[in-house]
């Protein structure tokens, strides 16, 4: 069993404060819970198990048992998980506050050891010091933490995590915060705690302490679309569906600038109990709009591209071509339920076909040209430096003509009305007959930016904001977008 979970279970009986703070879903009666998806460490009870999604941030970081309390490390309410969470720069003072909280909630002294020993020995055949019976006394104070970067903020979720070598399918990674503190001071704290234990337990305590305090930090992981659950969406089949978020709050709103001070609240039990008794939940509906989700969607589109359309003479738009084995697109994928992606695909293929027809003699769907290899990549605009490469390849294929030291290509083939409008909008109110490289880039990017302007998008979804940030955006009515009205970014 998880050491941290066991410690919470046994220490919860000590006093009123512990009974309130150390209440874990993993130690309570099991309730029906969502299915699990990934393996990793539950941030609430610190055990390595199968994880399900959090209703506060949509990340997979909570086990089936703890999910019943809907706790998130981004909450405002200073529950145990929130008090173990630190943000950005951790000072030595912040670490001292964390260690003091550990000492307050999980003390080890002669009186307590005797109390726990007597309790264990009340059971039959328990005169020996078997580790599984005293697991709660074998939790050393360490500076282990799981860390994740959300937008411009780095979060450290401290705790005692067993089985660090086990499989980790989450975006959180282990970091050793002992580098920010004095090793000798931490050693002294633990040796003092260890001195009250029987000899056989001291050996196990020391082994656990050194293995969990002398490890190398892991490299930071990058978030991906699959790290976020779809289960919080109002309608999973709608590409513009809002995400439902639940956050635990308190009546006296805490300032984000004092985020790292939450762990010091347990020093004053009466005040802490009053704060917790004022807790309530806030519900938010937030937009999916972010680079992470957009990159994922455009990546799927790029894999479904049928480049041969740009050599064809079909009268219909790219997605409406039927009975042509070279140009017909598979319309059964879920991604095509998004009208924005349909418009982007049709307009992009229409414009590239106009360029190809204006500058070459290719006129059949089955043509095998080198240009087709770069077409899928022109949809991957989220990383502009990489995107410039396939655009240059496309431009070179069009065999531009040098005019006064600058290269131009023709644009004299018919384009649809939407593309024409975008060209007029981005080319000073006209449709030019010749285009240079920058003009081609501007028009290609405008077709995507019309609906997904990644230049002004957050990297991660709004679900990763703190509760105070969500509250502030909600007051300004900026948590949702207007895509349900089919209004583009430009409009």
UniProtKB/Swiss-Prot annotation:
Cited function: Plays a role in the inhibition of host innate immunity by inducing the degradation of key host factors required to activate interferon production such as IRF3, IRF5 or IRF7. Associates with components of cullin RING ligases (CRLs) including CUL1 or CUL3, which are essential multisubunit ubiquitination complexes, to modulate their activities.
Region (Zinc-binding domain), start-end ranges: 42-79
The name this protein goes by in its record: Non-structural protein 1
Record InterPro entries: Rotavirus_NSP1
Chain positions covered by the region annotation Important for cytoskeleton localization: 82-176
Superkingdom of origin organism: Viruses
Region described as RNA-binding: 1-81
Record note on quaternary structure: Interacts (via C-terminus) with host IRF3; this interaction leads to IRF3 degradation. Interacts with host IRF7; this interaction leads to IRF7 degradation. Interacts with host CUL1 and CUL3.
Region (Interaction with host IRF3) location: 320-491
Species assigned in the record: Rotavirus A (strain RVA/Human/Japan/AU-1/1982/G3P3[9])
Keywords: Host cytoplasm, Host cytoskeleton, Host-virus interaction, Inhibition of host innate immune response by virus, Inhibition of host IRF3 by virus, Inhibition of host IRF7 by virus, Inhibition of host RLR pathway by virus, Interferon antiviral system evasion, Metal-binding, RNA-binding, Viral immunoevasion
């Amino acid at each position: 069993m998880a050491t941290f979970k066991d410690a919470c279970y046994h220490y919860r009986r000590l006093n009123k404060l512990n009974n309130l703070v150390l209440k874990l879903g993993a130690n309570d009666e099991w309730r029906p819970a969502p299915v699990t998806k990934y393996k990793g460490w539950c941030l609430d009870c610190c055990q390595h198990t199968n994880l399900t999604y959090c209703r506060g941030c949509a990340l997979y970081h909570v086990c089936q048992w703890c999910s019943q309390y809907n706790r998130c490390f981004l909450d405002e309410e200073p529950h145990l998980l929130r008090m173990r969470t630190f943000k950005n720069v951790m000072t030595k003072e912040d670490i001292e506050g964390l260690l003091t909280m550990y000492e307050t909630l999980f003390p080890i002294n002669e009186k307590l050891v005797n109390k726990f020993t007597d309790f264990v020995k009340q059971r039959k055949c328990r005169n020996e010091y078997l580790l599984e019976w005293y697991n709660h006394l074998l939790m050393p104070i360490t500076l282990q933490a799981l860390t994740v970067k959300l937008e411009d903020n780095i979060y450290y979720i401290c705790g005692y995590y067993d089985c660090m070598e086990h499989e980790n399918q989450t975006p959180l990674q282990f970091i050793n915060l002992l580098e920010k503190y004095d090793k000798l001071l931490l050693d002294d704290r633990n040796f003092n705690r260890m001195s009250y234990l029987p000899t056989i337990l001291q050996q196990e305590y020391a082994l656990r302490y050194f293995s969990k305090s002398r490890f190398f930090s892991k490299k930071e992981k990058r978030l991906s679309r699959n790290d976020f659950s779809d289960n919080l969406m109002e309608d999973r089949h709608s590409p513009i569906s809002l995400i439902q978020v639940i956050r635990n709050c308190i009546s006296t709103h805490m300032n984000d600038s004092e985020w790292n001070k939450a762990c010091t609240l347990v020093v004053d039990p009466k005040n802490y109990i009053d704060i917790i008794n004022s807790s309530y939940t806030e519900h938010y509906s937030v937009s999916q709009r972010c680079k992470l989700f957009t990159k994922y969607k455009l990546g799927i589109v790029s894999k479904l591209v049928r480049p041969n359309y740009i050599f064809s003479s079909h009268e219909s738009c790219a997605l409406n071509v039927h009975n042509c084995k070279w140009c017909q697109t598979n319309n059964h994928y879920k991604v095509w339920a998004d009208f924005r992606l349909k418009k982007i695909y049709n307009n992009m293929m229409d414009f590239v076909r106009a360029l190809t027809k204006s500058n070459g003699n290719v006129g059949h769907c089955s043509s095998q040209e080198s240009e087709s290899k770069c077409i899928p990549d022109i949809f991957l605009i989220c990383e502009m430096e990489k995107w410039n490469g396939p655009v240059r390849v496309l431009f070179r294929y069009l065999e531009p003509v040098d005019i006064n030291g600058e290269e131009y290509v023709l644009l004299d083939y018919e384009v649809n009305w939407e593309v024409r409008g975008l060209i007029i909008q981005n080319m000073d109110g006209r449709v030019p007959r010749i285009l240079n490289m920058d003009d081609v880039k501007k028009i290609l990017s405008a077709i995507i930016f019309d609906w997904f302007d990644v230049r002004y998008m957050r990297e991660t979804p709004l679900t990763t904001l703190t509760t105070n940030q969500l509250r502030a955006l909600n007051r300004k009515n900026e948590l949702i977008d207007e895509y349900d009205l089919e209004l583009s970014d430009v409009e």
